[in-house]
């Protein structure tokens, strides 16, 4: 299912919050008074919302729950009478799918037979991921978000009847809401790298639909263009570890794409970039030795509660292309973001962490560890993504997560990776060349066959002539 939201805001907090959506056809007016605003790199806070509009978003604040390693979800209702489900918010896919059969990891599931508004489309659905899969049946039903816009829409729903390594024990969500573009709403999946078994503390955040809530961020919003409308693809132009440039060709950062994906836990980097980044992080944190398995995300490191030496780990800065020509901005994350806390049962008195930067074979993925602590605006109407520091941003005694700019960066368009395209004329040329090569190989064979046939005919004629002579004798 491809959502059609002009504006979506995801704000994932870094602390525990009190407990207090987005389908095909939802189109909401932007409550920000931006009709004539110029497209600048920064959007001053006083110009992007009409006075008195703050109350419009009160019901949407703190509507996200979840865990960093298991995804963040929003409460939704499906069917008539409404059935309440927790749905994972995923900006890296475009399908809307819910559990529709009993499963050991589900406390509840969508029961189609109890909905008077369910319509069966009589189509099967099969979606494989790098790890795991699910399959089910496609239909439509009425959907709404209680802590969201006051809108009920009919949406396409994939009812999951069978799955393998898709639902996560203890995650508390029963379905997935893909908020990316229609181009990737194919019935297959590229990857679903959430963690299946680790227990972590619950945190919360907000998903605001239709505008911007200024109470949830500090400073200015900085926007980067959406390069292509499939995933939320952006362009990274520079990477620094503790202020030291990795000095790589910027195309390496975006090979074969760079996306913002709330459905992925880690910051995932292409192989060359990952190796360079880990080397720099190791050098910066050399006062302590860590096992190789830690850097590969396979082992935990633990310290006595309250004694984690955050200061030995470097900050990581990603520079993103800005909206103004030759200008970029940077987002800086702290080790409190890329060292993900994990509750280790065996050593519950310790603070244990997992390295949340991993290697990728499908480009850079800015996952939940990047988005946590930032206010992220998915502005589909203007084809851009905004970043600001959240109101509960990550910080320690000396450092804080930041969004800063502008920085002069020429030729940023060259940093984007372009998949080689082979046009039809090239394919036809290749086909003709192959046909000519085949003809050259076949010609000698044909000549040999013809020669053999001729010799056989001549021999047959000679034998007949010999028989005639013997009869005359």
From Swiss-Prot:
Cellular component terms per the entry's GO annotation: axon; cell surface; cytoplasmic vesicle membrane; dendrite; early endosome; endoplasmic reticulum; endosome; Golgi apparatus
Disulfide bond entries: 188-392, 250-415, 302-352
Location (main, coarse): membrane
Family matches, as InterPro entries: Aspartic_peptidase_A1, Aspartic_peptidase_AS, BACE, BACE1, Memapsin-like, PEPTIDASE_A1, Peptidase_aspartic_dom_sf
List of catalytic residues: 90, 261
Cross-link (Glycyl lysine isopeptide (Lys-Gly) (interchain with G-Cter in ubiquitin)): 473
Lipid modification (S-palmitoyl cysteine), residues: 446, 450, 454, 457
Mechanisms controlling activity: Inhibited by RTN3 and RTN4.
Catalytic activity: Broad endopeptidase specificity. Cleaves Glu-Val-Asn-Leu-|-Asp-Ala-Glu-Phe in the Swedish variant of Alzheimer's amyloid precursor protein
Any single Pfam family the record assigns to this protein: Asp
Domain commentary: DXXLL motif is required for a proper endocytosis and retrograde transport to the trans-Golgi network, as well as for regulation of lysosomal degradation.
Subunit structure: Monomer. Interacts (via DXXLL motif) with GGA1, GGA2 and GGA3 (via their VHS domain); the interaction highly increases when BACE1 is phosphorylated at Ser-470. Interacts with RTN1; RTN2; RTN3 and RTN4; the interaction leads to inhibition of amyloid precursor protein processing. Interacts with SNX6. Interacts with PCSK9. Interacts with NAT8 and NAT8B. Interacts with BIN1. Interacts (via extracellular domain) with ADAM10 (via extracellular domain). Interacts with SORL1; this interaction may affect binding with APP and hence reduce APP cleavage. Interacts with NRDC AND NRG1.
PANTHER family tied to this protein: ASPARTYL PROTEASE-RELATED, BETA-SECRETASE 1
The name this protein goes by in its record: Beta-secretase 1
């Amino acid at each position: 299912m491809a959502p059609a939201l002009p504006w979506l805001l995801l704000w994932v907090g870094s602390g525990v919050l009190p407990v207090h959506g987005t389908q095909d056809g939802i189109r909401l007016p932007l409550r920000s008074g931006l009709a004539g605003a110029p497209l600048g790199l920064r959007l001053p806070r006083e110009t992007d919302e009409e006075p008195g509009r703050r109350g419009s978003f009160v019901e949407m604040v703190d509507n996200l729950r979840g865990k960093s390693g298991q995804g963040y979800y929003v409460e939704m209702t499906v069917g008539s009478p409404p059935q309440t489900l927790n749905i994972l918010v995923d900006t890296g896919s475009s399908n809307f799918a819910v559990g529709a059969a009993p499963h050991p990891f589900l406390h509840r599931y969508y029961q189609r037979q109890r909905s008077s508004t369910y319509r069966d489309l009589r189509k099967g659905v099969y979606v494989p991921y790098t790890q795991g899969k699910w399959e089910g049946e496609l239909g439509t039903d009425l959907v709404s978000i209680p802590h969201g816009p006051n809108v009920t829409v009919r949406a396409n729903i994939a009812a999951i009847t069978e799955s393998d390594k898709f639902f996560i024990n203890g995650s508390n969500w029963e379905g997935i809401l893909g908020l990316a573009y229609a181009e990737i709403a194919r019935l297959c999946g590229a990857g679903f790298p959430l963690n299946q078994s680790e227990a972590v503390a619950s945190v919360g955040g907000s998903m605001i639909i239709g505008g911007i809530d200024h109470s949830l961020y500090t400073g200015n919003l900085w926007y980067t263009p959406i390069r292509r409308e499939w995933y939320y693809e952006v362009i990274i132009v520079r990477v620094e570890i503790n202020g030291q440039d990795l000095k790589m060709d910027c195309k390496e950062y975006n090979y074969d794409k760079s996306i913002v994906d709330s459905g992925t836990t880690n910051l995932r980097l292409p192989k060359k970039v990952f190796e360079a980044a880990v080397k720099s992080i190791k050098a910066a944190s050399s006062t302590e030795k860590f096992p190789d398995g830690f850097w590969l995300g396979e082992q935990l490191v633990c310290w006595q509660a309250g004694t984690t030496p955050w200061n030995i780990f470097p900050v990581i800065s990603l520079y993103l292309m800005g909206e103004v020509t030759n200008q970029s901005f940077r987002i800086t994350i702290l080790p409190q973001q890329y060292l993900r806390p994990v509750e280790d049962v065996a050593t519950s008195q310790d603070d244990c962490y997992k390295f949340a930067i991993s290697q990728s074979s499908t480009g850079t993925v800015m996952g939940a560890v990047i988005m946590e602590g930032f206010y992220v605006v998915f502005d589909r109407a203007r084809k851009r993504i905004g970043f600001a520091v959240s109101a509960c941003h990550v910080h320690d005694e000396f450092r804080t997560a930041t969004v800063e700019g502008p920085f002069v960066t020429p030729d940023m368009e060259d940093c984007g990776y372009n998949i080689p395209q082979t046009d039809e004329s090239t394919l036809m040329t290749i086909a003709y060349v192959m046909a000519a090569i085949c003809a050259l190989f076949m010609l000698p064979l044909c000549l040999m066959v013809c020669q053999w046939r001729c010799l056989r005919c001549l021999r047959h004629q000679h034998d007949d002539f010999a028989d005639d002579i013997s009869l005359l004798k």
